[in-house]
Every structure is written in C-alpha cells, then in structure tokens.
Amino acid sequence: MISVVIPAYNEEEAIGTVVDELIEILKEWSYEIIVVDDGSTDNTAKVVQEKRVKIIQHPHNIGYGAAIKTGIKNAANDLIMIIDGDGSYPVKAIPELLKVADHYDMIVGSRTGGEVKIQLYRRPAKRFLSMLANYLSETKIPDLNSGMRIFRRKEVEKFFNILPNKFSFTTTITLTYHTTGLLVKYVPINYYKRVGQSKIRPVKDGLNFIMLIVRTITYFNPLKVFLPISIVLFLIGLAVLLYQGIFLRNIADLPVMLIIAAFQIGFLGLLADLIVRKR
C-alpha cells in the first residue's frame, strides 16, 4: 500500500495528465493519490476535483515543502511517494522504484537517465551544490533534490522540525537521511521539460540552497563545517604572522586575531559536536 503525494501550485496544464498516468500505472497496487493544492490561483483544484483522487487545499501559497508535509500528515499509508505535478518526472518509472522499496529507507529517482532535460543555465549551479553536498555529507549523491522519491512516513516525520516549507525540502531530506546513516538508493530516471512555467528563482533559491546545505550538515555533523574554517583561519594567521615577523620585523594585531578566532571556532565546533552526539 502506498500514498502518492503531489504538491501542486498553478499546475492546471499538467496535473490532470499526471494523475491519469498515476492511476494507470498503479492499478496493480493498493494506493491513494493525494494532491495538495498550495493556494493555486488557476484551475488546478478544478482539474483535480474531476479525478478519482483526494485533494487538500491550502488557503494561500505556503510552499513546496509545506504541501508535501500536509500530504504526508493526511496519508493513510506508511509508504509515501512524492512526485511533482508538472509532468517532468516519468510516472512509468515508478514500478522500478517500488521494486526496491522494502530494502531501503528512501528510494530516489535520480535524474541521470538517458534523457534528462535540465536547462543549461541551471547546470553549473546544480553541479556546484552537488559538489558542496558531497563534500559536507561525505557521500556521493547523484541527485540532491529530485522531486520523485519514496520513503516511510514513520521515518520522515522524525525530521519534520528541520524540513523547510519551501523548495529546499528535498535537499534537506536527502542530506538528513545520509548524515543520520539511513539507507538511500538512487534509481536512474529520465527527466522531461516541465509543462508550464518554473517557480524556481535561480539566484535567490540558489543562495538559499547553499545556506541550507551548510545548516543541515552543521545540525548533524558540525565539525565538518567548523573544522575547515578553523584550519583555514589558522593557516592564514600563521602565514601573515611569519611574514610580518621575518620580513617586516613587526607583528600587527591581524594575525594574532586570526589565530585566536581559529581556535575559538575550532572549540565551538568541538562543543557543537559533543551536543550533537548527546542528542
């Protein structure tokens, strides 16, 4: 038994087709489909109401993550699948994800298949975010923020307090599962050009993603963030100190302050790590 949660905001052009495809592909399973209309101003709700699915409507736009959490809270089953309502994810790939659902805590549809339509201007930022996430989480993550994945309600609800209400929901849940030792399986899928206009703001959302990655890793593994900063400051301070002492014969306040700051940040990281381990 599986509950499929579809967060939707102004997706009138694609949501009907997505729901129809889900009903067809899931006919051999016991399932429910929950569409969470996140305050759409178009005919999204009207289109969904004509289908044999459950619809929940937010009174106004709260966010992608908030819509997913609403769907999870109202799901009848422990096994949850999320998929976007814009037609960009291949519904026909769902059976492949379900095949391994009993063996992993989360199965992610990784957009690394043979046909992947990601806009060119988004690829450098996506690559940078992936490299940052891979380093901080010490894990190879093929797709950090795929919107097609399966997980269990009892597991994800443990992290509701740190899962954001915006687009960064998927990024956070990926990092959270990896840094807490849960098993994640990536299944390659295709990814198509979405129907309608994207709601992502490249610059603002990109900066938010960076902050989110650092914050999430700090929450679970603070030394991974604090220690590199401490080492860099110490090395810079030491280099300046040696330069001033050897060549200028006069040591200013800057290198001393940098070295002191390095030790302070390092000890702060150690303290944060002790707190995390006692949780």
Please provide the spans of the model-predicted regions.
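A conserved acidic beta->alpha catalytic loop
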Residues: 37-45, 87
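Hydrophobic helical membrane-anchoring modules
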Residues: 165-279
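Donor nucleotide-sugar binding loop of glycosyltransferases
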Residues: 11-14, 40, 90
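Acceptor/aglycone-binding surface of glycosyltransferases and processive sugar-polymer synthases
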Residues: 58-74, 79, 91-167, 171, ...
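Cell-envelope/extracellular polymer assembly enzymes that use nucleotide-activated donors
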Residues: 1-3, 32, 172
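Conserved donor nucleotide-binding strand/loop of the catalytic core
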Residues: 30-34, 45-74
